[in-house]
């Protein structure tokens, strides 16, 4: 019978490739016949999809990116628990002995989105897929981070500020809510936060230079920001 740790590793690899699916790029081409990488920030995520392709493509991108992250966790949790030593699903819960295995799967899905092998290891910035995996992992933390994101964006009008706040808040929230969780889980949550912040490095530079674009549901762009 397959060892649950080996199965967790297999699930992580599969999650990486599921997380890597570039829905923003696909939807932009299907609905607008547009490559959203060639305008705005060049990113394949929800915000650039909104700026380049409009609200419909952006909403679908947000939904599908969240879903792909959630699906990775929701499928892996019972699958891993059902094999090997036959331990219960509860052992995969945050703070339980096997929680680190889901942490690895969460991290793999986010890394797949940011380092998509389908796009020569370029991709999005990990916010929507990150929300999906965290909601599926432990929804109260996911909703709290979503609330933090919404408040930060509402105050500043910068999506990147909300994204950075949520990314920094994730490992803090994970450690605060589950102080006795495994070191592996804490490491994975910290790595998700660090990687998302790293993916926003250009946004940080633009914020510091006063050149970051504010959120707009009506303004469209057809040229790259740096042109």
Task: Locate predicted features.
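Interhelical loop and helix-boundary elements at the membrane-water interface
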Residues: 2, 18, 23-73, 114-127, ...
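A cytosolic-side transmembrane-helix exit/cap motif
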Residues: 122, 146-150, 183-189, 206-213
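Loop-to-transmembrane alpha-helix initiation sites
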Residues: 143, 159-166, 180-192
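Helix-coil boundary and interhelical linker segments in multi-pass alpha-helical membrane proteins
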Residues: 1-10, 74-104, 135-141, 176-188
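Interfacial segments of multi-pass membrane proteins
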Residues: 50-55, 76-80, 108, 125-156, ...
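Residue-level signature of the transmembrane alpha-helical core
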Residues: 9-13, 62-66, 107, 111, ...
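Alpha-helical transmembrane segments of multi-pass membrane proteins
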Residues: 15-18, 77, 108-113, 149-153, ...
């Amino acid at each position: 019978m397959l060892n649950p740790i080996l199965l967790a590793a297999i699930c992580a690899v599969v999650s990486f490739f599921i997380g890597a699916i570039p829905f923003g790029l696909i939807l932009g081409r299907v609905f607008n016949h547009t490559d959203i990488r060639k305008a705005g920030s060049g990113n394949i995520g929800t915000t650039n999809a909104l700026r380049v392709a409009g609200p419909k493509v952006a909403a679908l991108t947000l939904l599908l990116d969240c879903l792909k992250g959630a699906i990775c966790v929701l499928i892996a949790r019972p699958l891993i628990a059902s094999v090997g030593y036959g331990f219960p699903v509860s052992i995969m819960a945050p703070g339980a002995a096997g929680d680190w295995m889901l942490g690895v799967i969460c991290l793999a899905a986010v890394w797949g989105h940011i380092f998509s092998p389908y796009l020569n290891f370029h991709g999005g910035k990990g916010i929507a897929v990150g929300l999906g995996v965290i909601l599926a992992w432990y929804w109260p933390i996911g909703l709290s981070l979503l609330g933090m994101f919404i408040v930060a964006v509402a105050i500043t009008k910068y999506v990147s500020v909300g994204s950075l706040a949520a990314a920094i808040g994730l490992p803090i929230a994970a450690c605060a809510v589950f102080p006795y969780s495994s070191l592996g889980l804490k490491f994975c949550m910290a790595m998700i936060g660090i990687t998302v912040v790293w993916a926003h490095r250009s946004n940080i530079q633009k914020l510091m230079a006063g050149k970051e674009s504010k959120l707009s549901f009506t303004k469209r762009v057809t040229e790259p920001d740096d042109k």
